């Protein structure tokens, strides 16, 4: 019996030394905590790290994919999204459930289109939940990471070691993590304390996760404390700061204007006078009467200059429609101005539909069940129900835009 106790103590010490992981609640407290939330010492499903799931992402989805759209859930279970029913979560990163939504429609006579679900986002591999590698791209677009290696911990540090110290330094050691640093109500750490970085994302100083990519940038951002919510009455404003596009370039370097020889859309560059003026004036197609004081659109967010000042970022993160100001000329376009991080209802994980001329017709979102004789047309509905189209915009009212609204590229470019 004494020998068994010694073995058990050694195993526990080994787990703690390796930093093996945590529950979802503990993760969102800022860093590593309850190891047994993800690991099973005697009856694991994965031999490599004694994981509770067959693989890393399956282990994550055990907590982040349960029924009910709330808080940290980012995967809607299959049973909750049958044909015609959209994924339920409205987190800023999007719901991975969109990867399972394939749409087939005929935009015109003799023309059939199939829009595969795996075109809607990052195809994490989570065998226990039926998520498989990208069926088209063998490597990350604009990069060389093996698509079969993509998992939640390719981007997130499942042990949450990266932290923000009291002097603002980002490090993997130096003080204990006392809480999350992701939210607009997150307190600044006192001397001898630290808070977790945004969403436990890997960054400068982190080790590589699945896929072997090492990040050299820090993803600075702040989100409202309530963020998985409908935007029917007020937007969810995430305050994005320095490092966003450089962080994405870790895997997608050839998609970025600063690291590619191709003709690509600028990122991590100031909007400048003309684009900032367009954004602030643009309300909808044909309506350029807006002002900077009320022009913010959560479907087309921007990076707040190049700041990593969390006092500034916290003041901008909002879900009450109180902070409505649009960009200054020094604010920046970033990857997440056009894309979400996980998945969306549209191809290439864009925030709005770029595969059609109009996103709103006859004053409503189009859909196969639309009451509008125009909105029901296949070239506008594109195989989706009204509920699916609306949810892809986080329930933002169609009336927020023009009755015949063109692509939201026009929020910056005003060509309509």
Q: Predicted segment positions?
A:
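A motif-centric signal for short, conserved binding hotspots located
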Residues: 25-416
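C-terminal segment of classical bacterial N-terminal signal peptides
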Residues: 14-24
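Bacterial N-terminal signal peptides that target proteins for export
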Residues: 1-11
């Amino acid at each position: 019996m004494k020998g068994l106790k010694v073995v058990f103590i050694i195993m526990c010490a080994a787990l703690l030394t390796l930093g093996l992981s945590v529950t979802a609640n503990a993760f969102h407290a800022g860093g590593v905590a309850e190891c047994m939330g993800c690991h099973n010492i005697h009856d694991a499903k994965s031999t490599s790290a004694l994981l509770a799931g067959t693989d890393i992402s399956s282990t994550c989805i055990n907590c982040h994919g349960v029924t009910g759209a709330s808080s940290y859930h980012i995967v809607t279970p299959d049973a909750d999204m049958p044909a015609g029913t959209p994924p339920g979560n409205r987190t800023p990163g999007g719901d991975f459930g969109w990867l399972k939504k394939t749409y087939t429609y005929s935009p015109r006579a003799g023309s059939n289109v199939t829009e595969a679900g795996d075109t809607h986002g990052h195809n994490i591999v989570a065998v226990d939940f039926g998520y498989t590698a990208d069926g088209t791209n063998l490597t990350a677009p604009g990069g060389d990471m093996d698509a079969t290696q993509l998992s939640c911990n390719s981007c997130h540090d499942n042990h949450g070691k990266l932290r923000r110290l009291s002097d603002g330094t980002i490090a993997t050691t130096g003080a204990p993590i006392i809480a999350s640093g992701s939210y607009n109500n997150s307190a600044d750490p006192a001397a001898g304390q630290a808070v977790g970085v945004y969403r436990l994302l890997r960054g400068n100083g982190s080790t590589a996760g699945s896929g072997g990519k090492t990040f050299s940038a820090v993803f600075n951002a702040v989100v409202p404390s309530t963020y998985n919510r409908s935007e029917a009455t007020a937007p969810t404003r995430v305050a994005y700061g320095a490092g966003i596009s450089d962080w994405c370039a870790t895997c997608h370097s050839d998609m970025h204007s600063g690291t590619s020889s191709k003709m690509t859309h600028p990122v991590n560059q100031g909007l400048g006078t003309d684009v900032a003026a367009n954004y602030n004036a643009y309300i909808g197609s044909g309506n350029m009467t807006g002002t900077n004081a009320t022009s913010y659109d959560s479907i087309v967010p921007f990076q707040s200059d190049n700041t990593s000042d969390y006092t500034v970022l916290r003041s901008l993160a909002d879900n009450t429609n109180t902070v409505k100001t649009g960009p200054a000329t020094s604010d920046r376009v970033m990857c997440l101005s056009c894309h979400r991080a996980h998945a969306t209802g549209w191809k290439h994980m864009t925030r709005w539909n770029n595969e059609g001329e109009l996103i709103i017709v006859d004053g409503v979102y189009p859909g196969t069940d639309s009451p509008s004789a125009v909105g029901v047309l296949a070239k506008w509905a594109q195989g989706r129900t009204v509920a699916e189209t609306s949810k892809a915009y986080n329930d933002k009212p169609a009336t927020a835009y023009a009755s015949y609204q063109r692509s939201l590229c026009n929020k910056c470019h005003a060509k309509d």
